[in-house]
A protein has these predicted regions:
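Helix-to-loop transition at the C-terminal end of transmembrane segments
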Residues: 46-48
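N-terminal membrane topogenic signal
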Residues: 12-30
Length: 355
């Protein structure tokens, strides 16, 4: 075993840390984006329209709900784009909670936008709600795409409810969750072609193009680009597979210049083992030993299809990685006694910390 996984010792570069003030800046930027959206709505006679009659007021409120919904939708895209500064400052658990809150708030506001807009247009045109809904969907530019976007986002929200999520495998839930990106993309033409702010205000157009492009850049750079670059750079592969106990397997992984991968004991990565069909599904596994030069170790318990495949991995199998993620590291310890609680295979990050 020792000979099979012996690796050269190389000084590990300490992973970068996010400054403490970054938390305040990130929160301020998110709040500022909501204020800007409200200010743009106000500048486009949003408040005056509230007082111009019931139908016009409903339409104006619906427009505000749609704008705030779109802004929150982009905020949640950035939250889950795995931007390193956000990950290091907050950790994925907190980011995931905020993403969930922003997502549900955005969807509820989106439903409010649809309801108020239909009621407002129906009141102005003096026709029935169903007839007005049909007219909006069929005749307005981008509305068919927006309807498809609403259906996709509804699917994501329904499967994110805890009762529904417990019935789904993680891999299935994660795949369904990715449809949110398609939903955001399909909603954009509606805003471009029929959105009052886009059509009437150059300042609003500049703002929305900026935030859409920033969200897109965040996904392309941090969610897709960085993991691809690290996987190509480090060329990680399975070095050895060790049966630790019935149903428990450790995998040693070797790579090029792994001492440059900014990972600490206690963190986890998303692993894709290129061992055949199903390789595209990522699995979150924590390090079960501190990084050693050009070696990493994970320990996995057989709890499902993905983890069961780990025991059958062969040395030389190539691996794609995302991460590292997580804030359970010695970096945040400031001295004094601590209590670490874990059970089952959840012990693995603590083993790495206490090694």
């Amino acid at each position: 075993m020792t000979a099979a996984v012996a690796g050269r010792r190389a000084p590990r570069r300490p992973p970068p840390t996010a400054p403490a003030w970054w938390a305040d800046v990130a929160g301020a930027l998110a709040a500022l984006s909501l204020l800007v959206v409200t200010a743009l709505w106000t500048a486009d006679r949003g408040v005056q329209e509230l007082l111009a009659g019931a139908a016009t007021g409903l339409t104006s409120l619906g427009r505000l709900a749609g704008l705030v919904s779109a802004d929150l939708m982009l905020v949640q895209v950035v939250l889950m784009a795995r931007v390193p500064l956000l990950e290091r400052r907050f950790g994925q658990d907190r980011i995931a909670r905020w993403h969930r809150l922003a997502g549900f708030a955005s969807f509820h506001l989106l439903l409010t936008h649809v309801l108020l807009t239909v009621l407002g247009y129906a009141g102005t045109a003096r026709r029935g709600v169903l007839a007005e809904t049909w007219d909006l969907v069929v005749t307005y530019p981008g509305m068919l795409l927006a309807t498809a976007a609403l259906a996709l986002l509804a699917l994501v929200v329904v499967t994110s409810v805890r009762a529904a999520r417990r019935r789904l495998r993680y891999e299935s839930w994660h795949l369904l969750h990715l449809y949110a990106y398609l939903g955001v993309a399909l909603a954009l033409p509606h805003q471009l072609w029929t959105g009052a702010d886009f059509l009437a205000s150059p300042l609003a157009r500049a703002y929305w193009w900026t935030v859409y492009l920033l969200a897109l850049a965040s996904v392309l750079i941090w969610r897709l680009g960085l993991p691809a670059w690290r996987s190509l750079r480090h060329r990680i592969e399975v070095a050895a597979v060790v049966a630790e106990a019935p149903g428990v397997t450790s995998v040693w992984l070797r790579g090029r210049d792994l001492h440059r991968l900014p990972v600490r004991a206690g963190q986890f990565l998303l692993w894709r083992f290129l061992d055949g069909p199903g390789w595209s599904r990522a699995h979150p596994y924590s390090l079960s030993a501190p990084p050693r030069g050009d070696l990493l170790r994970i320990t996995v318990k057989d709890l499902g299809d993905g983890s069961a495949r780990v025991a059958a991995l062969r040395p030389g199998t190539r691996v794609l990685v995302e991460g590292p993620y997580g804030r359970l590291t010695g970096q945040h310890w400031r001295g004094g006694g601590i209590t670490l609680l874990a059970c089952g295979v959840g012990l693995t990050p603590l083993l790495a910390l206490l090694w």
